[in-house]
Structure formats: structure tokens, C-alpha cells
Swiss-Prot record:
It is a single-pass type I membrane protein. Residues 189-231, 285-300, 307-320 have a biased composition (Low complexity). Keywords: Calcium, Calcium transport, Endoplasmic reticulum, Ion transport, Membrane, Signal, Transmembrane, Transmembrane helix, Transport. Belongs to the SARAF family. Pfam families: SARAF. This is Store-operated calcium entry-associated regulatory factor. The keyword Transport applies. The chain crosses the membrane at residues 158-178.
Amino acid sequence: MKHNYYILFLILISSLFLSNKVVESYGHRNNNKGGDSKILLKDVQVLTLRSGEMTKARRSSPIQQMECIGGTATKELELYPKTIQCYNMGSNGVDVQWKCEATLDSTVRLGTIDVSCEGYSYPEDPYITADSCGVFYQLEYTNEQRRKAALAEEETSWVQIIFCIAFIGLILYAVFNWCGSPQGDDDSNTAQNNTATDNNYPGGFPGNNNNNNNNNNNSNNNNYGGNYQGYPNLNNNNNAGGCAQPNNGGGGGGGWFQPGLWTGLASGYLFGRIHSNRNHHHYYNPSPSYNRPRSSYSSGSSGGSGISSSSSSYSGTSRR
């Protein structure tokens, strides 16, 4: 008798376990039903897209239903729309055309948009995967001065980056040209300069150089050689430092380090920074206008005007 109860208990536990699995499998199928069903694109009349939610997908990866991909107001995260609705406006003979609307702060508006849907079997399939459409949009300022300011800031940042890279590259090139050049030429130039110095150093009376060449050379070598601590050893070919010494008379690699070149580059860099900052402040601090509310654009940073307005933009359909 006890054995029969034990068998019944095992059957009951197994039934509960299997029923739980069936319920989970049914719920899983329902959750992915949108990814398995197809619909004719031209029959879709309205798309309601929400921020932070993902699309369904069958062949590719899901995408965000709404994604900002640029525009002059792309940094204004708090002004992003929460919902966008797109309405089927008919076909242009190639694909469905959409009008997308969103409720936004009056300081921004929708720019260029792109409605993207997943083709059911292939990208250009007339049928799409249900709930697979998303919208990529740009967010623009409605105020012309702020729009120009954002464009100028972006352009200035790129110019500064390019200038800094070029400036650093020029410095590195000059350093490698200075320190990495072979020292054989410098040594030969130094030897020639030493010979000229020994022959022409004022050690006697004018007119006696031809007759007393040997005496002058011996005298110069004895009196101005490396043994005299007050005068550098011109015949020493081993430089104290790791870089080749500058050749003031030969016009060699040392020309890179002439003060005029680096002073000019530094001055140009500082002038460019000052000029760009001045333009930046000029754009972001426009003179007050009595034709618009003071609360809309009182400063360069934007927290929005607090006034909502409807914004719309038009798009075709891209496939993935």
C-alpha cells in the first residue's frame, strides 16, 4: 500500500514539472510571436515607437525603436523625444513614405529621419517582420544662432585636433632629425672648421700666415688644444650628449631649432586658440532680442524652454 502511494506521489510531481515547462514554452512563443510573423509593409498604417525599447528581429539583430544619430542638438539628452509616431503617407512607386511626429521642447525639432524595417526573407522583401521597424533621427536646434554655434563648435574642435596632431608630428620629426642623424657628416664638418680655425686664428702679424703656417698651427695646437681647460677640445670627435651637436656654420639639421621657427609656431597656435574661443563666446552669447522670449535662450547651456510643441519630418523606408 505504501508502495502505491509513493508511485502516485512521483506521478504527481512529474505532472507538475511537465505542466510548468509547457507554460514556460507557451509564454516564450508568445513573447517572440512578433519576430516570427510577417506583414505586408504597405498595409502598415501607423508605427508607434518608444524610447528605450527594442524592435523584433528574425534574420538580423534587434535595434532600438528610436535612436538619435546626430544633429546640432544631439548633446541635449534631456530633450530627446519619448515617443515618435510615423504615419504611412503612401508609396512613391518604390517604397512606403512616412511622416513622423514627436512632441518636443520648443527649442529643438526633428531633423533628418530614417525609418528602418527588417525584410522577412531578404532585405527588399515586400513583407517585413512584424514590430521590426525603428527610426533613426537627428535633433536640431530651432534657433538659428544656436544651430550655427553648435556647428562652429564642432568645426573648431576638429580644426584644433588636426592642428595639434600636425604640431606634435612636426616636433617629433624635428627631434628625430636632430637626434637620429648620422654623426659622420657633423664630425667631418667639425674637422674642417677646426682646420680653418687653426689656420686663421689670430696668432701672428698680418702677412706672416704663408711663411709661418707650421709655426701657427703648432702654436695654436699647443696653446688652444684639448689640454687647456678654458677652451673646448675641438679635435674631440666624441660628443658629450646623445644628439649630434649643432653646426652653426654649416646650415645642417640644427636649423630646425632656430628660435624664429618655434616662436612663430607657438604664436600661431596661441592666436588660433584665442580666436576660436572668442568666436565660441560670440556665438553662445548673442545680443538680447526683444522679438523673442527672454526665457528661451538666456545662455549657451540649454535646459529647454519648458514649452512643448509638435515637430514632424518625412522619410522613406530603408531595409535591413
